[in-house]
């Protein structure tokens, strides 16, 4: 069976194409695991294995990356890493090239945030075509926030200053804590059930990622997306961006900005401008997402031809060769040690005392075998003799005599087998099993 030339791969080609598939389709990922086999050669690069109870994967973190890690990894430590799937082509090893490393626990919220963001984006919750425009004539605003928070005071102050005619309905809720997401969802549901406002403003003041975590909830994202009322998300400060900001119809950077966006000022010019700015910002965000994806693709293509990657690969090869050289030296030393021990043993075996001991052992062994052979031979001969005697006795006429028969012969010693060969007056000798008889024929019956 012949293979087509274009279907026959070289090993290098196969490993190269596998690397391109892994890097192109999987890319960068977050991974949590336990460190084992950690090593740091003189090159400054780190090599380790990440494992869990069922699997493991090799990892490499080059010097330029691991200098930003603020702790020294140790075997058995649980860590969270970010890296790109790749293949170390010279050996065909599937590995992860690490970019960052954190002790387990740190950065998990950020990881969950990115994972949820990617999931909801794939489901279409951030799509611009699903965003609704804000009403042109807003008369009543529903505010979903804490009844005692600074955000509510800021919003009311801005609305009073810009347009005191706008009515406000507050849907008080928790905006921090484990039950806050459920409370916000119920507030959105209540507002949609009553339909007493034109638009909803979801807001709270700034805080840490943990403080704002309730706004990064999947159930809340779907509640905002499914709301019949337009939703403006104004959570935190300008640098804070939550999942609710991506799902909402409009995002405002602060609570005050959200109030300004929903209020009119001097003939509605400010509202129109804010709306335009909001749409522009929204368009810029989507454009940025598109450009980020394009940048990742370009970076991937560049990495495939990047001399730096080749240099990193050569450095990794150097570390591997150095390890192999060390192992070869140890193996050579081990072989020389074994050879020395073997030669010492051979020299010991060549000593006269050792030879005499071996000769005595051999003589004892041969003598024993000789005695056994004689016994076996005599026993076999004795058995054959007994069998021959038994066969001879079985064939001997004397055996017939022992059963009551007799043998008669004439005076010449000739055995008589026919009565016609005997005359009256002949002398006969009859052999019995024990003894014999001498008789004279007085009658012959035919």
UniProtKB/Swiss-Prot annotation:
GO molecular function terms noted in the UniProt entry: exodeoxyribonuclease VII activity; nucleic acid binding
Keyword Hydrolase: yes
Self-association state and partner proteins as the record states: Heterooligomer composed of large and small subunits.
Function: Bidirectionally degrades single-stranded DNA into large acid-insoluble oligonucleotides, which are then degraded further into small acid-soluble oligonucleotides.
EC number(s) from the headed UniProt entry: 3.1.11.6
Compartments where found: Cytoplasm
GO cellular component terms listed in the entry, alphabetical order: cytoplasm; exodeoxyribonuclease VII complex
Assigned keywords, A-Z: Cytoplasm, Exonuclease, Hydrolase, Nuclease
Protein name (database record): Exodeoxyribonuclease 7 large subunit
Gene giving rise to this polypeptide: xseA
InterPro entries per UniProt: Exonuc_VII_L, Exonuc_VII_lsu_C, OB-fold_nuc-bd_dom
Similarity section: Belongs to the XseA family.
């Amino acid at each position: 069976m012949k293979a087509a030339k274009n279907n026959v791969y070289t090993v290098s080609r196969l490993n190269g194409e596998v690397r391109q598939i892994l890097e192109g389709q999987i890319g960068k990922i977050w991974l949590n695991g336990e460190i084992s086999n950690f090593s740091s050669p003189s090159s400054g690069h780190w090599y380790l294995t990440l494992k869990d109870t069922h699997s493991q994967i090799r990892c490499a973190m080059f010097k330029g990356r691991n200098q930003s890690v603020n702790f020294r990894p140790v075997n058995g430590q649980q860590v969270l890493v970010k890296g790109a799937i790749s293949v170390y082509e010279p050996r065909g090893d599937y590995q992860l090239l690490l970019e960052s490393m954190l002790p387990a626990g740190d950065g998990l919220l950020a990881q969950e945030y990115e994972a949820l963001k990617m999931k909801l984006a794939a489901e279409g919750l951030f799509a611009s075509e699903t965003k609704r425009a804000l009403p042109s004539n807003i008369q009543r605003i529903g505010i979903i926030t804490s009844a005692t928070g600074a955000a509510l005071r800021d919003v009311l102050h801005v609305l009073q200053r810009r347009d005191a005619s706008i009515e406000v309905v507050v849907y008080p809720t928790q905006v921090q804590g484990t039950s806050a997401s459920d409370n916000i969802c119920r507030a959105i549901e209540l507002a949609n059930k009553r339909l007493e406002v034109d638009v909803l403003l979801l807001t709270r003041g700034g805080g840490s990622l943990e403080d704002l975590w309730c706004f990064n909830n999947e159930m809340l994202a779907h509640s905002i997306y499914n709301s019949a009322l337009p939703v403006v998300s104004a959570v935190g400060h300008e640098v804070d961006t939550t999942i609710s900001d991506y799902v909402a119809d409009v995002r405002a950077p602060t609570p005050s900005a959200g109030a300004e966006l929903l209020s009119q000022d001097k003939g509605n010019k400010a509202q129109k401008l804010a709306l335009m700015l909001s749409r522009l910002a929204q368009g810029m965000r989507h454009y940025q997402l598109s450009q980020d994806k394009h940048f990742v693709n370009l970076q991937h293509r560049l990495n495939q031809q990047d001399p730096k990657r080749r240099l990193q690969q050569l450095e990794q090869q150097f570390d591997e060769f150095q390890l192999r050289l060390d192992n070869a030296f140890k193996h050579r030393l081990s072989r020389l040690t074994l050879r020395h021990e073997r030669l010492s043993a051979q020299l010991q075996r060549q000593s006269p005392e050792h030879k005499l001991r071996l000769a005595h052992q051999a003589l004892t062994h041969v003598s024993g075998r000789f005695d056994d052979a004689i016994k076996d031979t005599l026993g076999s001969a004795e058995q054959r003799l007994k069998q021959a005697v038994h066969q001879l006795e079985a064939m001997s006429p004397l055996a017939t005599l022992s059963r009551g028969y007799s043998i008669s012969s004439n005076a010449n010693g000739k055995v008589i087998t026919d009565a016609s060969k005997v005359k009256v007056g002949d002398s006969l000798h009859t052999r019995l099993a024990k003894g014999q008889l001498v008789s004279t024929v007085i009658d012959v019956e035919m």
